[in-house]
């Protein structure tokens, strides 16, 4: 895909690159940093849940503002600047309540950026929304570079390098957002239905439930996977490479998803994704001592995150059109990464503390099985859906 006058490919890709590089540090290694501060599993689960919980309200609030002002790019810029300065306060104190305060304040603004940027990207792409994956793949590459690099740095220096690296990356995010052009707004010449009437559609409600359950199932993974591997003898560099492997599989999928979606349809691929995700959690639960099986489980990240995310972004974009686009993407972030992620992280903290790692991942698999049933029952094929089947 080449850059054109209407699609600023490299500037959009650059934001994804650096934004997800920050996640390549935050997601795998922040729990290790919290563990180094002598927080227990319940406290770590709570602190990670705070980051997720702000996604319940923040994206939708900022999405509402963006939809009513048309200033989505300005919101992304302000949110990025405030995120940088608030996160810098993490160096003031290592107390639980201070870290909790900083995480809540920082993530309220940080979580405002991505949903608005997703909507901007879709607007830039126009009718070529299936090319989204060609831009989003740069985010995966940024994640890989960060997770491998920081895993290596931790072994050389110490886990204390994590917050320093994050602050540097947040600064680079600020630079990237000031290189971005404003997106083209889709003008609506006819009256639209209310956003509530869109949400009340059975297929949309089912999709929301499935998104919640899928991200809930990731609670143990995002919160404790690095600690889990470390407790079973894996080195920091190995942990970094395993995270990178999962995202590399995601990258390969993103390169072909624009061909796969039209060919197989959203419903079939969604069911396949959920089945593979349940398998992934069971493999991690029972075969952590086998590096080859853990290797295989990480390859399934292509399904549990990559494929699911591509399907969800596509469906929310098509159901929430025109003036609802910003809030549509925000709703996806709120119910999945927000509510699902927060409840999953919080639950995993208590589950890990009192029932252990195996039970925690088994519960994750059960949640995905419920999502599979909901999808099979309520998300049906509908012909004429932009020449694709749902």
What residue ranges belong to the model's regions?
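Structural signature of the two symmetry-related core transmembrane helices
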Residues: 74-88, 167, 268-283
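Cytoplasmic helix-loop-helix junction between adjacent transmembrane helices
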Residues: 104-138
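Helix-loop boundary and gating motifs at the non-cytosolic
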Residues: 2-52, 204-242
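Helix-to-loop junctions at the C-terminal end of transmembrane segments
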Residues: 57-71, 154-155, 252-266, 352
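Interfacial helix-cap and linker-helix signal at transmembrane-aqueous boundaries
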Residues: 34-35, 65-66, 137, 152-157, ...
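Hydrophobic core of transmembrane alpha-helices in multi-pass small-molecule transporters
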Residues: 17, 86, 96-114, 212, ...
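Juxtamembrane intracellular "pre-TM" segments in multi-pass secondary transporters
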Residues: 1-6, 179-213
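Symmetry-related core transmembrane helices of the 12-TM Major Facilitator Superfamily/SLC fold
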Residues: 161-178, 359-378
